[in-house]
Amino acid sequence: MQPIEIYTSSTCGYCFAAKRLLNQKGVSYAEINIQMEPERRAEMITRAAGQSSVPQIFIGTQHIGGCDQLFNLERSGKLD
């Protein structure tokens, strides 16, 4: 599987849910916490075509979207 990056914040329930799903599947990912690294927020918004909410999830260079989209991939068997 291509590298996964997930932009998060420390207090985001959807971020915790997305990370929990990835952890349960044994998938490694790079977490970018925009509260700890606020300078990365602009990068996230640019990469996510203007989306400013977290989580924003990328698999390789493809923008997946947020938590709902990640769970949709899981339901359709595309995270395996």
Where are these regions (language model features)?
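Thioredoxin-like thiol-disulfide oxidoreductase module
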Residues: I34-S52
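Rhodanese-like catalytic fold shared by cysteine-dependent sulfurtransferases
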Residues: Q24-V27, R47, L73-D80
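Non-catalytic, surface beta->alpha helical segment in thiol-disulfide oxidoreductase systems
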Residues: I59-D80
